[in-house]
Regions:
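Acidic catalytic motifs of isoprenoid enzymes
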Residues: 1-120, 127, 131-170
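Alpha-helical bundle/repeat cores within regulatory domains of eukaryotic proteins
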Residues: 171-175
């Protein structure tokens, strides 16, 4: 181990899959921090700005290694920001934007069948994660005034589910 060369340690050697996962994680973290800067303004955004700055060198390296994933991530996060600005009532549009990011993680699979299957699996996982996160954040977003498509789709300005909205959301999340 480089950190403790005198002490023998077990470690995992790098491989292509781990490098891919690490690069994609850095790209996602960087853009999430940049989004935090945009969402929180100058003063509250300082911690996000500092963290993004600290990650910048690693981000540039990861983006150079995975330019297509970086491009898809930037494009879909910009799409999400536009939907948030417009206070879009659609559940499918923002869920699709997030799902497209996760689906892009499969683009480097060598086998075409594996790429298609992984892409579909990650797409649906991403859609589900987005919807569940929106449901989990509903009350907090209603209180803080943050965008949440559930508020605009079902008129849940108080952050409380109605029986009808819960049933409609469950049907959407299940498909």
């Amino acid at each position: 181990c480089v950190a403790s060369p005198a002490k023998k340690r077990t470690f995992c050697e790098g491989n292509a899959a781990m490098e891919l996962a690490a690069d994609e994680s850095v790209i996602l973290a960087y853009w999430q921090l940049r989004d935090g800067v945009a969402d929180h303004g100058f003063r509250k955004g300082l911690k996000y700005r500092a963290a993004a700055r600290a990650l910048e060198r690693s981000y540039r390296r990861a983006a150079a290694a995975r330019p297509e994933f970086d491009r898809v991530t930037r494009r879909q996060l910009a799409r999400l920001a536009e939907l948030e600005q417009a206070k879009a009532p659609s559940l499918d549009e923002p869920a699709d934007a997030f799902a497209q990011i996760l689906a892009a993680a499969a683009d480097e699979a060598a086998d075409a069948v594996q790429r298609r299957v992984l892409g579909q699996m990650l797409y649906h996982l991403g859609r589900w994660v987005y919807l569940m996160d929106a449901a989990d954040d509903l009350k907090r977003d209603a209180e803080s005034g943050n965008y949440n498509p559930l508020i605009y789709r079902y008129g849940l300005t108080d952050g409380q589910w109605t029986p009808e909205s819960r049933a409609a959301f469950t049907a959407t999340a299940d498909h």
